[in-house]
């Protein structure tokens, strides 16, 4: 009682097949196999030394940088016309 015999596993397998169907179980196992292969490939790639990264040479400007003239410190004169009104 309490031990997992072969008959227990057969019953569990039959219940899983009835619940999920044959197509879902095989699809799930295929996805698990792909995941294991990807993991192994990633571990193998990690062990290999990687080529050193070569930095690109700095880009130099072909035109000199232009500067803006300084802002005037005095306020500009008013350009709008004033209207003379008579106060009655």
Swiss-Prot record:
Annotated spans, Disordered: 62-88
InterPro entries reported for this sequence: TatA/B/E, TatA/E
Q: Where in the cell is it found?
A: Cell inner membrane
Regions that span the bilayer:
1-21
One annotated GO biological process: protein transport by the Tat complex
Q: What is a single cellular component term in the Gene Ontology annotation?
A: TAT protein transport complex
Which Gene3D superfamilies does this UniProt record tie to the protein?
A: 1.20.5.3310
Q: Does the keyword Phosphoprotein feature in the UniProt annotation? A: no
UniProtKB keywords: Cell inner membrane, Cell membrane, Membrane, Protein transport, Translocation, Transmembrane, Transmembrane helix, Transport
Q: What does the record give under GO molecular function? A: protein transmembrane transporter activity
Q: How does it sit in the membrane?
A: Single-pass membrane protein
Q: Which domain of life is it from?
A: Bacteria
Q: What does this protein do?
A: Part of the twin-arginine translocation (Tat) system that transports large folded proteins containing a characteristic twin-arginine motif in their signal peptide across membranes. TatA could form the protein-conducting channel of the Tat system.
Which HAMAP family is this protein grouped with? TatA_E
| PANTHER family with a match to the protein in the record | SEC-INDEPENDENT PROTEIN TRANSLOCASE PROTEIN TATA
Q: Which family does it belong to?
A: Belongs to the TatA/E family.
Q: Quaternary structure? A: The Tat system comprises two distinct complexes: a TatABC complex, containing multiple copies of TatA, TatB and TatC subunits, and a separate TatA complex, containing only TatA subunits. Substrates initially bind to the TatABC complex, which probably triggers association of the separate TatA complex to form the active translocon.
- Protein name, per record: Sec-independent protein translocase protein TatA
The source organism is Methylobacterium sp. (strain 4-46)
Q: Which gene encodes it?
A: tatA
């Amino acid at each position: 009682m309490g031990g997992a015999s072969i008959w227990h596993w057969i019953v569990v397998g039959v219940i899983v097949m009835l619940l999920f169907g044959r197509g879902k179980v095989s699809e799930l196992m295929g996805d698990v196999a792909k995941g294991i292969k990807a993991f192994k490939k990633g571990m193998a790639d990690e062990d290999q030394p990687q080529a050193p990264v070569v930095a690109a040479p700095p880009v130099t400007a072909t035109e000199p940088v232009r500067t803006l003239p300084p802002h005037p410190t005095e306020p500009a004169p008013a350009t709008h016309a004033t209207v003379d009104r008579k106060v009655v």
